[in-house]
Amino acid sequence: MKIAIIGAGAWGTAIAMLLARNNYRVTLYTRHSAHTQEINQLHTNKKYLPNIILPNIIKATSNFSDIVDHEIIIIVTPSDQVRATIENLKQHSISNNAIIGIASKGLDHNQSKLLSDVVKDYLANNPLFIIAGPNLANEVAQGLPCALTIAAIQKEVQFNISTLFHSTNVITSTTEDIITIQVASAFKNIIAIIAGIIIAKQYGQNCKASIITQGIKEIVAFARAAGSTNPDISQFGVIGDLILTSYAITSRNTKFGYDLGQHEYYTNLINNTNPNLIEGIKAAKILYPLTVKQNLNCHIIDCAYSILHNGSKISYAIECMLKKINHETK
């Protein structure tokens, strides 16, 4: 079986290692020839996974044509690059039998769509799955125990993809709910930013746990509005991913939130921030108008948007959010 992964960052490489440990040959696509040479000759990916040696059966390429005949193609690019990647696959006339996987986090930046809907726009006949879980890429690469959720409408795809990853160290779960898992992947980074601010501003762990609980409510509300009839939040790729992202201080979004909480305005930190690495910044900009349009009470999204994109004072925005949540629960 020929498996390709588009995106040789930390998470893409970690996914490749999971498959390689189960003796599947994987082709990693990266745009940079120097990156390709490092992976193929040194079996390392030092920029993203320092001190990790890659299995020899992982091969890299910078030639997109090398991967278009693969039976399974997993996209692990930043969310703002997914549409262009799908367009590229379409232009290369990949087989209708090729199974497309999405491991990217977030929403489409052009049309504010779920990434699965972008795939359907271009590759409507191809089977599709979403993969997510509470996983730090470095721990996965080290071979530590981890868990994954495989979301796919077709039961056969759920089973086949789950089987590829399952091992004594990898727990897998499956669900038909491809909507909630994608909504959670977009919301979790925003919730993590606010959770980081909460700790930096010394509101305490109780408050942080309450915010995460509120975040789950907002994920469910948005997932229903997006078409999920019964949001499946119990999955590793939903509540598990949210908990890890919000509590791991090594999480980029949580750390960014903590750093942000040392100040009163985002502008105090903006020159030291790469918004391309902090998915929650972009996600808040996309999600806020969608929640307003759907008339949803997503107070965490409102708070994040006001801080990151509307210049609000951080302490004031947090207090307003807490008051709204308190009022709503009465």
Curated annotation (Swiss-Prot):
EC numbers for this chain: 1.1.1.94
GO BP terms: carbohydrate metabolic process; glycerol-3-phosphate biosynthetic process; glycerol-3-phosphate catabolic process; glycerophospholipid metabolic process; phospholipid biosynthetic process
Binding site for NADPH: 11, 31-32, 105, 137, 252, 277, 279
Entry keyword Oxidoreductase: yes
First-tier enzyme category under EC: oxidoreductase
Active site positions, chain numbering: 188 (proton acceptor)
Record-annotated disulphide pairs: none
This protein's pathway: Membrane lipid metabolism; glycerophospholipid metabolism
UniProt-annotated location(s): Cytoplasm
Cellular component annotations (GO), alphabetically ordered: cytosol
Residues annotated for sn-glycerol 3-phosphate binding in this entry: 105, 133, 188, 241, 251-253
InterPro entries, per database record: 6-PGluconate_DH-like_C_sf (IPR008927), 6PGD_dom2 (IPR013328), G3P_DH_NAD-dep (IPR006168), G3P_DH_NAD-dep_C (IPR006109), G3P_DH_NAD-dep_N (IPR011128), NAD(P)-bd_dom_sf (IPR036291)
Main location (coarse class): cytoplasm
A family per Pfam: NAD_Gly3P_dh_C
Catalytic reactions of this protein: sn-glycerol 3-phosphate + NAD(+) = dihydroxyacetone phosphate + NADH + H(+); sn-glycerol 3-phosphate + NADP(+) = dihydroxyacetone phosphate + NADPH + H(+)
Molecular-function GO term, any one: glycerol-3-phosphate dehydrogenase [NAD(P)+] activity
Alphabetic keyword roster: Cytoplasm, Lipid biosynthesis, Lipid metabolism, NAD, NADP, Nucleotide-binding, Oxidoreductase, Phospholipid biosynthesis, Phospholipid metabolism
Function description: Catalyzes the reduction of the glycolytic intermediate dihydroxyacetone phosphate (DHAP) to sn-glycerol 3-phosphate (G3P), the key precursor for phospholipid synthesis.
Sequence similarity: Belongs to the NAD-dependent glycerol-3-phosphate dehydrogenase family.
Name assigned to this protein: Glycerol-3-phosphate dehydrogenase [NAD(P)+]
Native species: Orientia tsutsugamushi (strain Boryong)
Higher taxonomy: Bacteria, Pseudomonadati, Pseudomonadota, Alphaproteobacteria, Rickettsiales
